[in-house]
C-alpha cells in the first residue's frame, strides 16, 4: 500500500510592530515561490496584540499570497472572551478567503503557551486541551492542530505522562500535530512508536530548525534544555564555533540530512522553522524539493 507524499511547510513570526513589516513581506513573497503546503504564523504570549500581529499576517499570507495558513493561538494569558474575539477575527479572514476561493478550512495551532516569569496567567485555559475543547464548542468549523514534544514537554514529569496528555489533545479534537524542533531523528522515531501504541493516529509533522550561527545555537541551548544534541551535531558547533560561514553551511547540511532521513522513513510532513529567513527556506527547498508533493493541505 503506497503512502501519501509528505508535506513541506514553513513557520514565520510577526515582526515587532515598531520594526515594520517590509522584511517579512519580502521574505514571504520569496517563500511563495517555493509552494509550501502551508505557513504557520506564531503568536506571542502577553507581548503584542494578536489581532495586529498574528491575525494581520495570517490575512496577508492567505489573501495576498494565496497560501494556506495556520494561526498559532497560545491561551494561558487569554480569557475566554479574548479567545472568542480572536476566533471571530480569524473567521473574517476565512470568510474573505471563501469569497476568493483560494484556500480551504481555517486552521489553528492550539497552544497553552509559555509561562512568563512574574506574570500571572489567566485561569480559563490552564492546558492546551482546555483551549481545544473551547474552540470545538464555540467554533467547530476550525480545524485544530496541536503541538507535541518528541523529547518530552519541559513541564511533564516523564514521557509517559506527556504522551497521555497528548492523547487527550487528540481526543479533544486535534486533527494533526507539529513537533518541537529536534536534532536526533531516532528520538523522533521512538516518540512516533510510543504515540502509535497510545492510540494517537493523526499525522505528525516533524519540526526542523537549521542552526545558522553561534548566537542562535546559544539561545537554543538556553531555552530548549530538554533537546538532546547528538555527537555529530555537537561536533559541528565545536568545530565551527568561530567560523560563521562554515557553521552556516554545516548547519544547513545537517538539517538537509535530517529531512532526507525523515522522508525516507515516511514522515507525514516536515515543518521548517525558518526564523523569517527566506534564504534558508530556499536552500532547504532546493536540496529536498523532489521529495515533496506541492499540493496544499485542505
Where in this protein do the model-derived segments appear?
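Conserved N-terminal beta1-alpha1 strand-loop-helix module at the mouth
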Residues: 1-41
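Active-site mouth loops of central-metabolism enzymes
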Residues: 7-23, 69-82, 88, 145-161, ...
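Conserved, mostly hydrophobic/aromatic
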Residues: 11, 39, 100, 169, ...
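Active-site beta-loop-alpha junctions enriched in small/polar residues
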Residues: 12-15, 42-46, 72-78, 113-115, ...
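Active-site pocket-lining/capping segments in soluble small-molecule metabolic enzymes
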Residues: 19, 123-149, 155, 197-257, ...
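Glycine-rich, positively charged N-terminal anion/phosphate-binding segment
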Residues: 21-29, 47-65
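Glycine-rich, proline-tolerant flexible connector loops at the mouths of alpha/beta enzymes
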Residues: 35-57, 113-125, 174-188, 194, ...
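Glycine-rich anion/phosphate-binding loops
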Residues: 75-99, 122-126
Amino acid at each position: 500500500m503506497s503512502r501519501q507524499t509528505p508535506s513541506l511547510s514553513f513557520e514565520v513570526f510577526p515582526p515587532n510592530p515598531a520594526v515594520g513589516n517590509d522584511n517579512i513581506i519580502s521574505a514571504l513573497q520569496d517563500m511563495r515561490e517555493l509552494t509550501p503546503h502551508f505557513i504557520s504564523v506564531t503568536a506571542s504570549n502577553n507581548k503584542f496584540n494578536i489581532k495586529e500581529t498574528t491575525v494581520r499576517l495570517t490575512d496577508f499570507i492567505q489573501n495576498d499570497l494565496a497560501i494556506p495558513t495556520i494561526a498559532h493561538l497560545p491561551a494561558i494569558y487569554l480569557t475566554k472572551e479574548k479567545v472568542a474575539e480572536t476566533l471571530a477575527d480569524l473567521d473574517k479572514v476565512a470568510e474573505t478567503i471563501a469569497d476568493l476561493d483560494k484556500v480551504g478550512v481555517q486552521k489553528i495551532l492550539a497552544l497553552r503557551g509559555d509561562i512568563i516569569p512574574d506574570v500571572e496567567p489567566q485561569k480559563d485555559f490552564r492546558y492546551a486541551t482546555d483551549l481545544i475543547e473551547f474552540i470545538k464548542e464555540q467554533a467547530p468549523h476550525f480545524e485544530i492542530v496541536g503541538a507535541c514534544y518528541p523529547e518530552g514537554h519541559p513541564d511533564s514529569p516523564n514521557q509517559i505522562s506527556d504522551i497521555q496528555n497528548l492523547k487527550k489533545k487528540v481526543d479533544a479534537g486535534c486533527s494533526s500535530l507539529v513537533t518541537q524542533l529536534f536534532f536526533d531523528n531516532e528520538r523522533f522515531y521512538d516518540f512516533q512508536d510510543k504515540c502509535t501504541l497510545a492510540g494517537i493516529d493523526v499525522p505528525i509533522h516533524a519540526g526542523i530548525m537549521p542552526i545558522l550561527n553561534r548566537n542562535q545555537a546559544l539561545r537554543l541551548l538556553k531555552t530548549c534544555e530538554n533537546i538532546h544534541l547528538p555527537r555529530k551535531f555537537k561536533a559541528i558547533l565545536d568545530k565551527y564555533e568561530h567560523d560563521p560561514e562554515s557553521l552556516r553551511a554545516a548547519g544547513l547540511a545537517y538539517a538537509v540530512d535530517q529531512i532526507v532521513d525523515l522522508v525516507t522513513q515516511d514522515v507525514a510532513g516536515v515543518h521548517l522553522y525558518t526564523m523569517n529567513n527566506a534564504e534558508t527556506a530556499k536552500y532547504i527547498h532546493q536540496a529536498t524539493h523532489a521529495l515533496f508533493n506541492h499540493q496544499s493541505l485542505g
